[in-house]
Amino acid sequence: MKSYTPYFMLLWSAVGIARAAKIIIVPPIMFESHLYIFKTLASALHERGHHTVFLLSEGRDIDPSNHYSLQRYPGIFNSTTSDAFLQSKMRNIFSGRLTAVELVDILDHYTKNCDMMVGNQALIQGLKKEKFDLLLVDPNDMCGFVIAHLLGVKYAVFSTGLWYPAEVGAPAPLAYVPEFNSLLTDRMNFLERMKNTGVYLISRMGVSFLVLPKYERIMQKYNLLPAKSMYDLVHGSSLWMLCTDVALEFPRPTLPNVVYVGGILTKPASPLPEDLQRWVDGAQEHGFVLVSFGAGVKYLSEDIANKLAGALGRLPQKVIWRFSGTKPKNLGNNTKLIEWLPQNDLLGHSNIRAFLSHGGLNSIFETMYHGVPVVGIPLFGDHYDTMTRVQAKGMGILLEWNTVTEGELYDALVKVINNPSYRQRAQKLSEIHKDQPGHPVNRTTYWIDYILRHDGAHHLRSAVHQISFCQYFLLDIAFVLLLGAVALYFIVSYVTKFIYRKVKSLCSRSTHSTVNGHYQNGILNGRYKGNGHIKHEKKVK
């Protein structure tokens, strides 16, 4: 059967470049992996004739490019200080000291940076003069919603994480839709559904009573007009582009203005550098294992590094490990350490047998794209939810960094390497991921063009954002039905009692009016009263 996908993609491209737009992107103040996705997207938008501007703090590292321009501002972080901040939090994670208080501290850094942006009048006035057509918000840092409101520009959400926010408004039955950070699948028993409900309620209360009010106080501080709540701003997004995919995510209800665009960084493997090519080509007998924890490589504790080195050294496969820092003392002879490696190109090599990863979303999509089985040791954020899905789909095994032993790690690696079901599932998920209309980055630019062409595409937005809590859950209908049921109960009860009393009265009168088979009407000696006269009646002998 002839495929028409290339023709559709060509049509999308032709329509998309009909009008060049000015787009501003507000990335999170931390996490370089998020910025890397946005840079890839900016390059794709540039190819379609759009001009993209990044709003970044001074000192934050980013490669120069003619595909985008930069608008700098004095923020709370630069690349060095944000990295130091993350390292301190990661040390607390590995030592078990990351408490709720420190999570609030992370949020405070986000809102302090937002305050610095909103209060910078020179910055804001300069941005207003640019007259942007669209602003892209990463919900990991909700200041983007505030900036969009301040500039009076249309905005859409581009989530660089696995998160499917409840703020989207899509139905999320807790019986089979696992809440973010619940580490649950769509197959839950009673206790798991109880846990899912608890995580959902805590999450909703945290967002409603902690996160959103912090940003609302910033808007009140600077008297942003027209006055709007953060709740309304978050729900006012024209489109939600989520970095997930039907191959990875559990099936769930969604809405027309929600699109899956996970896998933006995926691409075919390119030729390896000559030295690496010789190294992987020499692993034909047993193959090789790739080890990479992404940007988290610098955060690994010495204890975890030693566990990894011990388990990897026992494998018959060769091992190439992206690593920086002090070399583990128990490093095996089969293991090659390297500070940077072409991860995507190694994943696409025919001799690869498994991937040991932290479960970062970008890495998992590259792994899925090439059909490679995974052993994941999540570190923080959405790593846990990502690996939960990988394990549930049969593509890999999830291990907990704080409980895993060297032996358990070795057993998990041996299992995914020697059990063909893991590779088969990985290859099947690769087929599903690729069997969609166009590459994820092309789908993303198509939808961005779509909302630009249709002035925000309000026709895609559900009315769920215009109804109250009581209306959504039909509490008003339930109240009326309950009121009707109560009223009906009292009416039926009253009528029943009334009929009962009448019947009882008639029966009582009938009983007292009949004696020995004769009707007496209450008059002794056989007399009865009729028409006001006393009459006599002969008794029948």
Curated annotation (Swiss-Prot):
One Gene Ontology term from the biological process aspect of the record: neuron projection morphogenesis
Residues bearing carbohydrate: 78, 333, 442
Question: Which tissue types show expression of this protein?
Answer: Brain, restricted to the oligodendrocyte-containing cell layers of cerebrum and cerebellum.
Q: Which residues form a coiled coil?
A: none
**Keywords assigned by UniProt, alphabetized:** Endoplasmic reticulum, Glycoprotein, Glycosyltransferase, Lipid metabolism, Membrane, Signal, Sphingolipid metabolism, Transferase, Transmembrane, Transmembrane helix
Pathway linked to the protein: Sphingolipid metabolism; galactosylceramide biosynthesis
Topology with respect to the bilayer: Single-pass membrane protein
Question: According to its UniProt record, where is this protein located?
Answer: Membrane; Endoplasmic reticulum
Protein name from the UniProt record: 2-hydroxyacylsphingosine 1-beta-galactosyltransferase
* Gene that encodes it: Ugt8
